[in-house]
């Protein structure tokens, strides 16, 4: 049973994937917010921008009720229209955004998969990085994880916060291993979408 993850030195971000839920998605988001992660990244890659914007409004409202930061994914123009100044983007999108557009955000997170990408994202103004995938995960079946050595190398090469992603669980031993590598936190996808019992 999980009560809270917000009292950890190691920061936990929830990343959504509504296809993993066993109950209505918004109900699951509320359950996630009840354990107070550092933030919720609304990552629903199959939606159109219009569909995403409609869902984002509802998720932002739930996050606001629980005072949990909501980070919108990919559709940065929609984020601005909704008054959300925290976004998580693929590196190719960050490369196309102007400096003036970047200034409209208080937080820009970037997904990276190599040390070179990490350095590039930092140079372009990323506030934090997610580096992965670190552990084996069903989301990346057949792909070998990059592992803790990769995470440690990324953390050594940049001066911005790094979160591990990929196969991250509610496992303090795992969290400790990532923290020793220099990561500030980890992103949990499957575990967050399947929380069913709270203390």
At which residue positions do the language-model features occur?
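Glycine-rich, proline-tolerant flexible connector loops at the mouths of alpha/beta enzymes
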Residues: 41-51, 133-140
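Acidic (Asp/Glu)-rich catalytic clusters
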Residues: 29-36, 64-65, 100-103, 122-125, ...
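N-terminal amphipathic alpha-helix/helix-capping segment at the start of soluble metabolic enzymes
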Residues: 1-28, 153
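Catalytic cores of alpha/beta
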Residues: 70-85, 113-126, 157-188
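Glycine/Thr-rich beta-alpha phosphate-binding loop at enzyme active sites
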Residues: 82, 86, 109-156, 195-197
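Hydrophobic faces of well-ordered beta-strands that scaffold small-molecule active sites
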Residues: 10-16, 40-42, 70-72, 87-89, ...
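Glycine-rich phosphate-binding active-site loops on the catalytic face of alpha/beta enzymes
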Residues: 14, 89-101, 130-142, 167-199
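Alpha-helix-loop-beta-strand connector modules within alpha/beta enzyme cores
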Residues: 52-72, 91-94, 98-114, 144-169
């Amino acid at each position: 049973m999980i009560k809270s993850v917000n009292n950890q030195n190691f920061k936990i971000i929830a990343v959504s994937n509504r296809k993993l839920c066993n109950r209505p998605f918004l109900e699951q988001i509320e359950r996630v917010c009840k354990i107070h992660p550092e933030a919720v990244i609304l990552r629903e890659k199959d939606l159109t921008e219009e569909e995403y914007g409609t869902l984002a409004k509802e998720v932002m409202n739930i996050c606001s009720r629980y005072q949990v930061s909501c980070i919108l994914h990919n559709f940065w123009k929609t984020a601005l229209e909704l008054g959300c100044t925290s976004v998580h983007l693929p590196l190719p999108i960050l490369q196309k955004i102007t400096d003036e557009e970047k200034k409209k955000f208080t937080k820009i997170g970037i997904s990276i998969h190599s040390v070179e990408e990490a350095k590039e994202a930092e140079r372009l103004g990323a506030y934090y990085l997610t580096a992965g995938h670190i552990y084996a995960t069903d989301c990346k079946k057949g792909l070998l994880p990059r592992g803790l050595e990769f995470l440690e190398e990324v953390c050594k090469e940049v001066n911005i916060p790094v979160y591990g992603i990929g196969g991250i669980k509610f496992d303090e031993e795992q969290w400790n291993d990532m923290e020793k590598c220099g990561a500030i936190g980890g992103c949990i996808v499957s575990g967050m979408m399947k929380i069913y019992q709270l203390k």
